[in-house]
């Protein structure tokens, strides 16, 4: 409950910055294929931090979707695993084991408060020895991921077409879809 209150309070203070993710196309990503090595270099990104739920797979999936794994493999082959990190609010053991086995050099954020707290982004910058403004988070939520970007003074990409599986998890996926719609509505109206 404290995290929800924190998100609402900080979201109110950062509402104009959050509105940029809705109004500026350059800050949005509609498909993972839009995040290319060239775009990351153009945006001066040293490390791309990935959320899991909604970005790499639907909620509660144990591994990324096959097309996501192909994209991730291609990105790792071009920019290297050391330029990627994973920061999920649900670091389930199966997910961590998958990344440790399949992509062992991708940094796994651990031991920090969940988003929207900026601790995970700061941890990546500190671990990699780079300024925090050279870290970018790819996330599908405004009041968690994008808010943590604003609070950390880093960069972010708002993932506008998150993965979902309504057949497998109808209640959970509907809940998160409603949350995303409410976030967008509040930021559009109040920002």
Feature map (PLM): residue ranges:
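Asp-based, Mg2+/Mn2+-dependent phosphohydrolase catalytic module
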Residues: 1-43, 62, 68-69, 73-137, ...
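Asp-based phosphoryl-transfer active-site loop
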Residues: 43-60
């Amino acid at each position: 409950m404290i995290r929800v209150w924190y998100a609402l309070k900080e979201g109110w203070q950062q509402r104009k910055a959050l509105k940029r993710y809705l109004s500026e196309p350059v800050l949005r990503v509609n498909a993972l294929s839009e995040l290319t090595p060239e775009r990351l270099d153009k945006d001066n990104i040293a490390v791309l931090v990935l959320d899991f739920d909604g970005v790499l797979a639907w909620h509660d999936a144990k591994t990324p979707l096959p097309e996501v794994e192909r994209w991730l493999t291609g990105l790792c082959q071009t920019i290297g695993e050391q330029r990627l990190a994973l920061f999920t609010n649900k670091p389930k053991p199966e997910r961590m084991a998958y990344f440790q086995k399949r992509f062992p050099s991708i940094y796994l954020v651990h031991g920090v408060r969940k988003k929207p707290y900026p601790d995970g982004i700061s941890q990546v910058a500190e671990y990699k020895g780079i300024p925090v403004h050279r870290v970018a988070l790819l996330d599908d939520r405004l009041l968690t991921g994008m808010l943590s970007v604003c609070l950390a003074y880093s960069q972010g990409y708002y993932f506008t077409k998150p993965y979902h599986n309504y057949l497998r998890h109808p209640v959970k996926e509907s809940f998160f879809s409603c949350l995303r719609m409410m976030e967008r509505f509040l930021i559009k109206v109040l920002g």
